[in-house]
């Protein structure tokens, strides 16, 4: 990582270099390779006074992290909304363990209906966060929790809630349908994922036929192998599987050819 500070009239020239410039690598200067960088740019407003250089660095770090996620040679400019987003993300990560312990996350069931008969034939478990009397939209907290392994804790919590609901409905003599529970791809590197899933289901004494695990497409060859292992393991236990967001991940045709989704 490099940080540079310069007068704004040089900005266009600097950005041209950052986006890519041929650099010779032999003594004669005839062999060249194109070298580029991703960069975050903070244009310091005229007349701004900072107490310390860290205030500037914080802004650069936010925007450079965003630039690194883009394609090669990307340049992103800072604006104050980015600081607000970062502060909100940090707050969510800080209060998440307490919110989970307080059971602020609730399960909503979205029905799957057979359009020919009108019968409910299944459901998908959706997570909603109740905080201070209001619902926090999923897009405000799911992407934040996916930045680390917090999302895995939430997924397991949701699976446990679904298992408890299913067992309660069965005990009440209600007609129960299969419920799908979404698991983030963040789980896939976990070598004991299958064991963790089955422990939650079996500790609740939930009949396997009422659970479906919904997994998101992978983006790498290694993760694809992990996904394949988990799906085969779940099906050996009588747990149905489905694929979420099909068509946006890695090797979509292999995904449906090599893995026996339900």
What residues fall within each predicted segment?
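Structural preference for long, well-ordered alpha-helical segments in enzyme cores
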Residues: 17, 21, 56-63, 125, ...
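Nucleotide second-messenger and two-component phosphorelay signaling modules
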Residues: 27-30, 70, 102, 114, ...
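Catalytic core of bacterial c-di-GMP phosphodiesterases, primarily the EAL and HD-GYP domains
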Residues: 47, 117-124, 149-226
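C-di-GMP signaling machinery
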Residues: 62-106, 116, 145-151, 185-194
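The catalytic core of metal-dependent phosphodiesterases that act on cyclic dinucleotides
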Residues: 198-262
């Amino acid at each position: 990582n490099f940080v540079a500070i310069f007068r704004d009239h040089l900005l266009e020239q600097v950005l041209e270099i950052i986006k890519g410039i041929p650099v010779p690598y032999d003594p004669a200067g005839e062999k060249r390779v194109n070298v580029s960088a991703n960069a975050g740019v903070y244009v310091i407003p005229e007349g701004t006074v900072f107490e310390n250089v860290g205030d500037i660095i914080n802004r650069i770090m936010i925007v450079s992290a965003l630039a690194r996620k883009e394609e090669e040679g990307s340049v992103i400019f800072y604006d104050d909304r980015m600081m607000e987003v970062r502060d909100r993300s940090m707050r969510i990560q800080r209060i998440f363990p307490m919110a989970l312990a307080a059971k602020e996350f609730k399960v909503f069931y979205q029905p799957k209906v057979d359009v020919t008969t009108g019968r409910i034939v299944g459901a998908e478990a959706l997570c909603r966060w109740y905080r201070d009397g209001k619902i926090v939209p999923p897009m405000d907290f799911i992407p934040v929790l996916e930045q680390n392994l917090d999302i895995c804790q939430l997924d397991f919590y949701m699976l446990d809630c679904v298992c408890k609901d299913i067992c309660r409905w069965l005990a009440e003599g209600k007609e129960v349908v299969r419920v799908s529970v979404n698991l983030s791809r963040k789980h896939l590197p976990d070598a004991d994922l299958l064991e963790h899933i089955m422990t939650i289901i079996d500790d609740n004494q939930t009949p396997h036929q009422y659970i479906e695990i919904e997994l998101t497409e992978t983006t790498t060859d290694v993760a694809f192998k992990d996904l394949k292992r988990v799906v085969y393991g779940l099906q050996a236990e009588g747990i149905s599987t489905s694929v979420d967001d099909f068509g946006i991940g890695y090797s979509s045709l292999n995904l449906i050819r090599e893995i026996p989704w339900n």
